[in-house]
Amino acid sequence: MSDIHSLLVAAILGVVEGLTEFLPVSSTGHMIIVGHLLGFEGDTANTFEVVIQLGSILAVVVMFWRRLFGLIGIHFGRPPEHEGKGSGRLSLIHILLGMIPAVVLGLIFHDTIKSLFNPVNVMYALIVGGVLLIAAEVLKPKQPRAVGIDDMTYRQAFVIGCFQCLALWPGFSRSGATISGGMLMGVSRYAASEFSFLLAVPMMMGATVLDVYKSIGFLNMGDVPMFAVGFVMAFIVALIAIKTFLQLIKRISFIPFAIYRFIVAAAVYVVFF
């Protein structure tokens, strides 16, 4: 792969990663399709995908830095603006409760989960995840019990964490699973999305660092420019995608995202079967 071509591939995949990582549409499904069409597959490609996820994570940190620092008691000038109708406040305990179920299962079944990364499993995950999004919209309480993220209870955070376990199924979408779980538990669409983004930072950071450590043998200095381009593109596009997404869900439901997932599942079938 020539230098120019590899950088172009990196830029394209960085855009795809940034666009899809935090939307409930499955970044994995998109990455395997685009990677296959670009002829970029194998161990180096897998390592590349892991590294550029760090760019997406950095976008969340930049977007929610005040809230993230506030969780650990560090305030720069003023605490994060209160979001909700009650007097509660999102705390680090909420995040830890949301992490525990997936962390435990992920560590126990890490190798088994990695073996599930194939087009068939991803296709089915896209479909089931789409059905869950529709179910969340249909079955959610008419009046959310947690209007803002600061209204969330420990129980809601833990149950959302249990739903996050579904995202261990490649192609399911971590944001899709957590947002759906939040809505079914009476958390507003917007608050569930915000909590999903905040929960993503420690979850994705931990998983990515573990994957990078296990993939270190596939890294070489010649790949640094390609990885850097992918990282930067993922960061920039994810930043735009998160801002746009949070504005969009104030006006529309998740039904269009569910339909889009079904379309992507069909695309996986066409490309790989």
Curated annotation (Swiss-Prot):
Q: Quick one: where is this thing mainly located?
A: membrane
A Gene Ontology annotation in the biological process aspect, one of them, is: cell wall organization
Catalyses which reaction(s): di-trans,octa-cis-undecaprenyl diphosphate + H2O = di-trans,octa-cis-undecaprenyl phosphate + phosphate + H(+)
| InterPro entries linked to this entry | UppP (IPR003824)
List the residue ranges forming a coiled coil, or say none.
none
The organism's place on the tree of life at top rank? Bacteria
Tell me the GO molecular function terms. undecaprenyl-diphosphatase activity
Q: Which residues cross the membrane?
A: 13-35, 45-65, 90-110, 116-136, 157-177, 190-210, 222-242, 252-272
- From the record, give the cysteines joined by S-S bonds: none
Q: What does this protein do?
A: Catalyzes the dephosphorylation of undecaprenyl diphosphate (UPP). Confers resistance to bacitracin.
* Family statement: Belongs to the UppP family.
NCBIfam families named in the record: PRK00281.1-1 (NF001388), PRK00281.1-2 (NF001389), PRK00281.1-4 (NF001390), undec_PP_bacA (TIGR00753)
The protein's name is Undecaprenyl-diphosphatase
This chain's source organism reads Klebsiella pneumoniae (strain 342)
